[in-house]
Amino acid sequence: MLSSNDQKLEKLDSFYRPPVSKQRTSAEIISEARNALRTVRTQRPFTPREDQRKLFGPASSRSPENRPPSSFSLHASSFELSDSKPISGTRLRPLELKPKAPASPGTEDACLSFPKAPLDPAKIRKISGARARFYRAASQGMLLPDRSPPAAHSKTVDESSKPVSVGSSTARRNGTHLTASSATGQLKSPPLLTCDQGFQETTEQEVSLLSQLRRGGDPGKRRARASSCPSSSDLSRKETRAASRASSQEQETDTEVDEVFWKARIVPILHELENEEDIEEMCAACTQLHRTLEEARMLGKKFKRRTVLLKALYKLVDADSDPLSLKLAKLILALKVSGKNLLNVCKLIFKISRNEKNDTLMQEDNILESLLEVLRAEELQSNTEAFLYCMGALKFVSGSPGFLTEMVNKGAVEILAQLIKEMTEDTEKHGVCLPDSGHLLVQTTATLRNLVDSPLTRSKLLNMGAFPHLCTVMEQHADDKDICTNIARIFSKLTSYRDCCAALASYSRCYALFLSLLNKYQKNQDLVIRIVFILGNLTAKSNQARELFSRETGSVETLLTLFQSFYHHKENSPKLQLSEAKPQAEAEDVLVKLTRVLANIAIHPRIGPVLAANPRVVGLLLRTLESKSLGDCEELVINTIAAINNLSFYQVKSSVLQHRKLYVAELLLRLLVSNNMERILEAVRVFGNLSQDHDVCNFLMQKNVHKFMITLLEAKHQDICFSACGVLLNLTVDKEKRAILKEGGGIKKLVDCLRDFGPSDWQLACLVCKTLWNFSENITNASECFGDDVANTLLILLSTFLDEELALNGSFDQDLESYHRLHWETEFKPVAQQLLQRIQSHHSLLEPLPVPSF
């Protein structure tokens, strides 16, 4: 006789899925999500690597005549000297009230000469040799003097060739007295380039004074001179003029120091470049020149001899050597050229970067820093074309793994993001795009697309809040397919990561933007597939994204229109040869991504029932299953079944699937006869939802599906065992069908699942206990119901698993441990306790006596 507690247990109904209207705990929601609703994953669309490095690849929407060229010729004559004039830092002297008499020819300026007139073109044509031609032309008056003297044009400056007098405290150079504490003997130095068509010898005194003169003479005197200047409020007009003259004299001294440094240190290197024939030696000389100028702080625009130096560097471009040109370009950029020269040097680097073999060369020369400095320091509006080729070079090298980390560490992400922000703000301000800004944005977004492979890039973009700016670019340039495709590729990569996906999902304007682009580019597979992939990522990870997307007008209709269009394209295309099958495969890939979005948004409790009641949605999904053979487009079939599975979860009267449930079950039967376990798993999941209906259960019994479910319990695959057990649970709700568990050793296989997966999967353990509970509803003897061995095994397993210390003594991290405890306490424990009590109350440890023989 059963106790009162046992009688109460016996009155419990069979386990089945609770009605949707019943309030559920969080554990039940998680469990149901595993049973019926789940998001669908898919691969990111493949972007093939372009064979050639060009500004715009073969897939570009720009016609060749409407885009900047990737191939061009570049020579020394392409550069301009007008840009090379240095910025003067000299302060003008106050005007003297009394006129001064003209200086005599013997005064300090007598050594200077006026600039010579340009050479006769006929003479220039007679000069042969690239480098020799430059240096002869440079020495015949092309090197501009510091000041304009009254002397004759062709007169050689005598004072410039005189040695510094030994023992004198003053060294006279070009008519200017330079202070020096001492000077020692005279030794030969490398020849110097002078303004009278030749090189001259330099004395050691000139070289020995450099270090002191570069510091401005005697430090004590400089400090005394500086400290002796009174405040401006106390100066009389006379004192002001005196102070101004003192400052001017100091600047003149610095100028003369630069002149000595130029002749002693720079000209010898230029002389070497003139006479050297070996490219490696010329590269070494360029490196030495760059280092020397950097040490002397002569880089930038204020160097007086900058014009002469730049002209020398421009001439060397004709050597047509990538290693040499790269070093020249780096030095020219360091001299802060602008205008056409900046454009040409960026073109020069772009030209070099087109050859992938030069990547190592560019990395060794650290050209990245120079390119990024152009983008960081120069003005965008006046240098858009230069930025274009600069960014093109960065795009090429950013695709090389060796440059990725270096570019990110050097601030490339911040520079690109700021550039994008600046262009979007200018467009918003003026209402029109800057000239060539579209071309520049193509290169910028393509570069950023390569950089987002770095985790540090993703972190920086999140911290900068760059996603809205990228969306704004797509809005402003919606007619530019190249820009939209690049940004779609960026978001395709970023939304594959949870934090980036959440950031974009929270930007509510993105959904209307994506839908607008889908409607605009319906026939452009390359763009459509990426936007749909992004929407699939957003709706897979965020219920808010499902809600926001579904609220947009025409959201579902847009998906269905695309689905129907690409479905017809796929179905109406004849069977193609392997080489011609690419468009057909791309159409299938779009359908894969579209079914994924439908499956994901169906998880939302408000959207799911609406989709299930939409005949067009269900019709397209079923038509896909009808037309696909088992060997055709594996992923599309699986995603379609997953979408049907999520829709079949909603047991509402308006559901089209509920009205066609038997037809759906028949379609799914053929998927069970497959070697693909993923297909089988998806089909079994749908049966788990459909088998809640009595008619479907009868259909499954007629087709012996229950036997297949019992066989699947041996799969040793948790998800397959879970889904198969769910179908058996629904079948055993009917008392007449409970005996099926005895077929094929079903009871023992269920107990084996409990033993194998229980400690790691309390949801599966709960499902097994529910199925055994249904099976044993009319139990009178545990041994007769389960068998002696199975009953004893059940008693041991249930007793062990109900011991909290033993059951939850797993090596899990804190979050996973909390998850396991939640399911153990709320799902497994209540059912297991009931089942254990039932077995114990109907189980005797006494062995029956043998029947005596007479």
Curated annotation (Swiss-Prot):
- Where composition is biased (Low complexity), the residues are 58-73
Q: Where are the ARM repeats?
A: 255-294, 298-337, 356-396, 401-442, 455-496, 499-540, 544-583, 585-605, 606-649, 651-692, 694-733, 735-777
Record note on disruption phenotype: Male mice are infertile, while female fertility is not affected. Spermatozoa exhibit multiple morphologic abnormalities including short, thick, and/or coiled flagella, whereas sperm heads conserve an overall typical hooked shape.
> Which keywords does this Swiss-Prot/TrEMBL entry list?
Differentiation, Repeat, Spermatogenesis
Task: Specify whether Cell inner membrane is a keyword of the entry.
Answer: no
The GO annotation for biological process reads: cell morphogenesis; cilium organization; flagellated sperm motility; nucleus organization; sperm axoneme assembly; spermatogenesis
Q: Does the keyword Repeat apply?
A: yes
- Which stretches of sequence are listed as region Disordered? 1-116, 140-194, 206-255
Comp. bias regions, Polar residues? 74-87, 162-187
Q: Which Gene3D superfamilies match?
A: Leucine-rich Repeat Variant (1.25.10.10)
Described function: Required for sperm flagellum axoneme organization and function. Involved in axonemal central pair complex assembly and/or stability.
Name listed for the protein in its UniProt record: Armadillo repeat-containing protein 2
